[in-house]
Structures are given as structure tokens and as C-alpha cells.
């Protein structure tokens, strides 16, 4: 009876955790499609992207190192794990593009999560047309992931 008359202050936290769970589910789907969900840095990516989605106003001016420093004592190692995992996603995406240029995953992510020119450069490297690998911008990758996770709801 007491619960009926007391104001429910937990509703916002429940909806926030439901929103957070939805963002994490969307993020895990994307990382699975890229083939990097099992990589060590995928946990770091999930942590940072969830934070970016929950605090969009404070993240705009922060660097990736500053973001990483919020979650661990050694932000450089976290940033390196994220970089390696994101690069593995780039390589997996390039392989998909080589196999089937019209692959749904390739079409969806080659120009949104990564710079398409860099995906092409990685495809050329795999074909051994060049020795230069594709580059990636971690900030762009994380921001694009956050955007896709928020708008996939």
C-alpha cells in the first residue's frame, strides 16, 4: 500500500537502463557484423560508445585519450586496444568487399564507420597492389558507432 502513494523516482533510471541496454544490444550487433565482437578491445569500444550515447553534450570536446582516461588508469593501452580492434574491423570489411562488392554489411559500414577511400586502400593492400594499409580515425569510428546505436532504436 505504501508503494502506491510514494512518488516513483526510479522510472527514469529504469528507462535509462533500458535505453542503455538497447544501445548495447545495437552496438553488439554492429560489432558482430564486423566480426570484432570477440576482440579484446570490443569491451572498451562498448564502454566508450555507451558513455558517448549517455553523455553526448560532454563528449563533443573530449579527445579519445580523455575519454579513455575516464575508464582506466592507462588510457594509452585502452586507446591502442580500440585502435587494433577497429583496424581488424576495417580488414574484415575490406575482405567482405573483395568477396562481394554488394554485400549488405560492406555497403552499410564501408562509408559510415570508416572512410571509404581507406577501405579501398585496405582492399588494394589485400590484393597486393600496394603495401600501404588503410588508415582509420578512431574518433570518427566511435562517433559513427554512437550515432548508429542511438538511431537504430
List each language-model region with its residue ranges.
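Generic surface-pattern signal
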Residues: 6, 32, 36, 50, ...
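C-terminal output/effector regions of signal-responsive regulators
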Residues: 11-77, 81-82, 90
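Generic marker of "main functional regions" within proteins
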Residues: 41, 55, 59-62, 77, ...
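Short, charged amphipathic alpha-helical surface segments
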Residues: 1-10
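Charge-biased C-terminal accessory regions appended to nucleic-acid-, cytoskeletal NTPase
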Residues: 94, 98-153
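Flexible loop/N-cap segments at domain edges
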Residues: 63-117
Amino acid at each position: 500500500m505504501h508503494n502506491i502513494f510514494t512518488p516513483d523516482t526510479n522510472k527514469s533510471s529504469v528507462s535509462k537502463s533500458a535505453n542503455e541496454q538497447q544501445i548495447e544490444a545495437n552496438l553488439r550487433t554492429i560489432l558482430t557484423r564486423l566480426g570484432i565482437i570477440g576482440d579484446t578491445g570490443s569491451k572498451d569500444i562498448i564502454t566508450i560508445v555507451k558513455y558517448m550515447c549517455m553523455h553526448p553534450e560532454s563528449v563533443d570536446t573530449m579527445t579519445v585519450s580523455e575519454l579513455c582516461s575516464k575508464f582506466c588508469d592507462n588510457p594509452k593501452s585502452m586507446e591502442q586496444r580500440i585502435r587494433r580492434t577497429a583496424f581488424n574491423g576495417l580488414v574484415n570489411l575490406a575482405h567482405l568487399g573483395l568477396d562481394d562488392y554488394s554485400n549488405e554489411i560492406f555497403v552499410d559500414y564501408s562509408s559510415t564507420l570508416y572512410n571509404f577511400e581507406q577501405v579501398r586502400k585496405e582492399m588494394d593492400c589485400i590484393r597486393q597492389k600496394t603495401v600501404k594499409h588503410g588508415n582509420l580515425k578512431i574518433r570518427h569510428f566511435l562517433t559513427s558507432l554512437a550515432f548508429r546505436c542511438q538511431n537504430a532504436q
